Amino acid sequence: MREYKIAAIPADGIGPEVIAAGLQVLEALEKRSGDFSIHTETFDWGSDYYKKNGVMMPADGLEQLKKFDAIFFGAVGAPDVPDHITLWGLRLPICQGFDQYANVRPTKVLPGITPPLRNCGPGDLDWVIVRENSEGEYSGHGGRAHKGLPEEVGTEVAIFTRVGVTRIMRYAFKLAQARPRKLLTVVTKSNAQRHGMVMWDEIAAEVSKEFPDVTWDKMLVDAMTVRMTLKPQSLDTIVATNLHADILSDLAGALAGSLGVAPTANIDPERRFPSMFEPIHGSAFDITGKGIANPVATFWTAAQMLEHLGEKDAATRLMSAVERVTEAGILTPDVGGTADTQQVTDAVCEAIAGSNILNMAAVG
């Protein structure tokens, strides 16, 4: 029996709702597979913890998390806590402290979900966005001077290192190489940002020589938004900076139908530390407690987590079950359905328990 220790951090807003749904689905997979078990410990860190303790997580938070095989994260952010405190107090310290430098965000149109793009269905939009997750625009460097005075100045410094760019570029090329189309698009803004972004272009050209079977091209980030919208079939694997990929992946989720179906994995490819898996969507306080949060993104990131742990059959079974459920029209309101979170979760669990899930071809 293979055993895994998972740290669950539901955090804020709808985070606890979707993480509860994800844990229910993981339990269903355990029962269906019968050859692995997941032991979960839940941490109450987040905005409520901050209001009580003045910090988003304890000082030894990272040390507590080191013993786990993976981290299952909900969402962070609250209306009465500044966003920079919630982000820099919890999620970013985990990503940077554990050197989770590869943020991997798959996007595709799931069967049964109608995307906003005309003539775009399952198979037409099937991307993976690789986001540099350790430096760049979110390096945290900069400052403010003369605060409150007319001459106040604020600086936000983007840092790009050769080692950081090279390793994310190599990761993206390897991922593209493993996908059927072997196609990579490198996104920068090197016409206007003539230092760090030009270095990105140069390193991409250098690394590409290691992958002669991968076809690659370059796009400026503004032009990339147009291409994603008008020619989604022309894209496959995409790599971009911390900020650019953050923005593009939200656009990708919307183009696929909803951020409620968009997952993300914060990966330490060298496996020195636990990697973290989360839905892209935020804490969504406007629907918190209503029971209508879309759990599909959390199920998808749970599949990413299972694959990272080596449980590829379980990951495939989970995504097959999800696609059967969406195809059947069991959908939450954000994607045009009337089902609630629990109904979608129960349907996925029932699909997992059904026979021959692995042998059923996923639609799309």
Curated annotation (Swiss-Prot):
It is found in: Cytoplasm. Its EC number is 1.1.1.93, 4.1.1.73, 1.1.1.83. Keywords: Cytoplasm, Lyase, Manganese, Metal-binding, NAD, Oxidoreductase, Plasmid. Binds 1 Mg(2+) or Mn(2+) ion per subunit. Mn(2+) binds at residues 222, 246, 250. Its cofactor is Mg(2+); Mn(2+); K(+). Induction: By tartrate. GO terms for cellular component: cytoplasm. The keyword Cell division does not apply. Pathway: Carbohydrate acid metabolism; tartrate degradation; 2-hydroxy-3-oxosuccinate from L-tartrate: step 1/1; Carbohydrate acid metabolism; tartrate degradation; 2-hydroxy-3-oxosuccinate from meso-tartrate: step 1/1; Carbohydrate acid metabolism; tartrate degradation; D-glycerate from L-tartrate: step 1/1. GO terms for molecular function: D-malate dehydrogenase (decarboxylating) (NAD+) activity; magnesium ion binding; NAD binding; tartrate decarboxylase activity; tartrate dehydrogenase activity. Its main location: cytoplasm. It catalyses: tartrate + NAD(+) = 2-hydroxy-3-oxosuccinate + NADH + H(+); (2R,3S)-tartrate + NAD(+) = 2-hydroxy-3-oxosuccinate + NADH + H(+); (2R,3R)-tartrate + NAD(+) = 2-hydroxy-3-oxosuccinate + NADH + H(+); (2R,3R)-tartrate + H(+) = (R)-glycerate + CO2. NCBIfam families: TTC (TIGR02089). Belongs to the isocitrate and isopropylmalate dehydrogenases family. Has multiple catalytic activities. Apart from catalyzing the oxidation of (+)-tartrate to oxaloglycolate, also converts meso-tartrate to D-glycerate and catalyzes the oxidative decarboxylation of D-malate to pyruvate. This is Probable tartrate dehydrogenase/decarboxylase TtuC. The lineage of its organism: Bacteria, Pseudomonadati, Pseudomonadota, Alphaproteobacteria, Hyphomicrobiales. The gene is ttuC.
